[in-house]
Amino acid sequence: MSVFKGEVTALPPDKSISHRAALIGALSDGTTEIVNFSGGFDNQSTLAVLQASGIALIQEECAGSYGRRIRRVVIESRGLWSFLAPQAPLMCNNSGSTMRMFAGILAAQPFESVLEGDSSLMKRPMNRVADPLRQMGAQVELSFSGTAPIRIQGTKDLHSLEYRLPVSSAQVKSLVAFAALHADGQTRIIEPIRSRDHTELMLGLETIDQPNGERVIIVPGRKRIESKPFYIPADPSAACFIVALALLAKGSDIIIRDLCLNPTRTGYLAILAGAGAGISVENSRVIGGEAIGDVLVHSEGELNSLVISDPHEVANVIDEIPMLAVLSAFSSGRFELHHAAELRTKESDRIDALVVNLERLGFQCEQYPDGFKVNGRIAMPKGVVSIESFDDHRIAMSFAIAGKATGVDLAISDIGVVGVSFPNFFEIIESLEV
């Protein structure tokens, strides 16, 4: 089996922060410079819908740290109502973040627009998008099954509200916040279970933590947003795959540079450290309100099996669960997950996708509506094992890491889907292999 050593300086820029930086730049008054913008398919979809809606922007390469070439995006805008009616439906491709968050902005624009996506995105539920926007005064139409296309008749007369999030969703929280920026008063968003907080940090919104554990986000309406520069750190959700590679391949040592260490994004590091993983952080600092640092990962032996059952914990590792599940199964033979029904409405039904593929690899699994359990390995299949990616980048990468680290020969369908979030995935892995 292979061993992996070295430092990673070219992880994809954070996907979540890149989306928000572009959208906030389009809402700002002036020139917004975004340094180290993500080149992933999803983030490029956000830039494309902005341009199709009349926002002027340029994207170019420039010199970055560690001798890298990085992307720089410059957005010119005139504030909250700078958008123009698109001439055709806005294509979000596979990006649920683009579709959901941009819907909040379009709800406040005085024209009709339509948001569409690829075949996968058009199957994902969008009632959670439509409901708060309708309450604020926008007209929103979905398909009969509650999915895209999303047809929005926006209005400049949105009104503020107090909105309690029905599920833990940073995307829904953000779309309500973006709409509320245009509303006629102060909006209060109540978050029972805390999700990633990039939108609040980047907009400088007031937050109030309640004694019962809830968080209230205060969004002032019709306030000018001054343009400011953004720097995008490395994506912790992408880093999860490199961390797993180091932990599965015995004798490996990897350093990941300039990683976003926002506490709402690094729950998986705490979970793995608690299971016996050799993980440490150095060179910590804060840039633009976000914690950043270098993460050192050392393979120190077998990990304890992972049990993820606390709703707050699930919310903070929702994107990393596929890799955590595969890592735990291959390391200890066991894994258990509860309170994660949200996974069934991602790019694929990730619970089912994980179970199907783990069973092909000889693991005994049991799934239920909000999670699943791995109960050990019955037998190791011989020869090449076919893995179904379900056209889901995180499923594809999770099993690719397992195959590379353990030497199991896997044939993964539609492997090019990794480009959605991690275009240089295989290039980085190959650079680390000793």
UniProtKB/Swiss-Prot annotation:
UniProt KW keywords: Amino-acid biosynthesis, Aromatic amino acid biosynthesis, Cytoplasm, Transferase
Any one cellular-component term (Gene Ontology): cytoplasm
Active-site residues, Swiss-Prot/TrEMBL: 319 (proton acceptor)
Pathway the protein acts in: Metabolic intermediate biosynthesis; chorismate biosynthesis; chorismate from D-erythrose 4-phosphate and phosphoenolpyruvate: step 6/7
Enzyme class name: transferase
Recorded catalytic activity of this chain's protein: 3-phosphoshikimate + phosphoenolpyruvate = 5-O-(1-carboxyvinyl)-3-phosphoshikimate + phosphate
Keyword Membrane found: no
Main location: cytoplasm
One Pfam family in the UniProt entry: EPSP_synthase
EC nos: 2.5.1.19
Biological processes annotated in GO: amino acid biosynthetic process; aromatic amino acid family biosynthetic process; chorismate biosynthetic process
Residues passing through the membrane, by range: none
Binding of phosphoenolpyruvate, residues: 15, 96, 124, 171, 350, 394
InterPro entries per record: Enolpyruvate_Tfrase_dom, Enolpyruvate_Tfrase_sf, EPSP_synthase, EPSP_synthase_CS, RNA3'P_cycl/enolpyr_Trfase_a/b
GO MF terms, alphabetically ordered: 3-phosphoshikimate 1-carboxyvinyltransferase activity
Annotated binding of 3-phosphoshikimate, by residue: 15-16, 20, 169, 171, 195, 319, 346
Compartments (UniProt record): Cytoplasm
CDD domains for the chain: EPSP_synthase
Quaternary state and interactors: Monomer.
PANTHER family linked: AROM/DEHYDROQUINATE SYNTHASE, PENTAFUNCTIONAL AROM POLYPEPTIDE
The protein's role, per its UniProt record: Catalyzes the transfer of the enolpyruvyl moiety of phosphoenolpyruvate (PEP) to the 5-hydroxyl of shikimate-3-phosphate (S3P) to produce enolpyruvyl shikimate-3-phosphate and inorganic phosphate.
Family the entry assigns: Belongs to the EPSP synthase family.
HAMAP family linked to this entry: EPSP_synth
Name of this protein: 3-phosphoshikimate 1-carboxyvinyltransferase
UniProt organism field: Chlorobium phaeobacteroides (strain DSM 266 / SMG 266 / 2430)
Gene name, Swiss-Prot/TrEMBL: aroA
